[in-house]
Amino acid sequence: MSEIGAATNLLLPIHEMQWNRWYYEREKLRLFSSFVLLGTSGAITAAEGALDTQYGNTYGIRIELFNYPHALPKVYPKGWTIQPEVAHRFTDGSICIMRSDQWRKHFSVALVVAKTAIWLNKYEIWKRNGHRWPGLEQKH
C-alpha cells in the first residue's frame, strides 16, 4: 500500500480530532476560500466550492462526507461532467484522488480539496496531450 504524503497544515492532530473537529476543519478549509461545509439536522454532510486550474478554468466540486472521517469522502463534479474515457474516476462518477485504503482519519476536508486541485490540473493536461495521464499512477 502506498502512503499519501500531505502537508502538515492539512492534517488534524489528535487533540483537534477529539475536541471540536468541525471547528478545526473550518479553519483548515479557509485555505480554499470558495469552499464551505454544508449540513442538515445539525450534521455536516458535504463541502462545496470551486477550484481554478493552471489553464484558467474553474470547476465546481461537491465532496460527500458519508461516514466521515472514517471513510474516504466522495468527490463529484458540480455543474460539469468528467470525460467518460478518463481512467482516474470511479464507476459512480466520483473523482479518484486516492484509494480508500490510503485514507486516514486524521486527513482533513482541506486535504481532499488539495488532492482534488491536483487531480483537476492533471485532468486538464490529460485533455490536451492525447489522453495520457501525467505523473505516477496507481491501480484502483
Question: Where does each model-flagged region fall?
Answer:
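UBC/E2-like fold recognition across ubiquitin and ubiquitin-like conjugation systems
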Residues: 1-60, 69-140
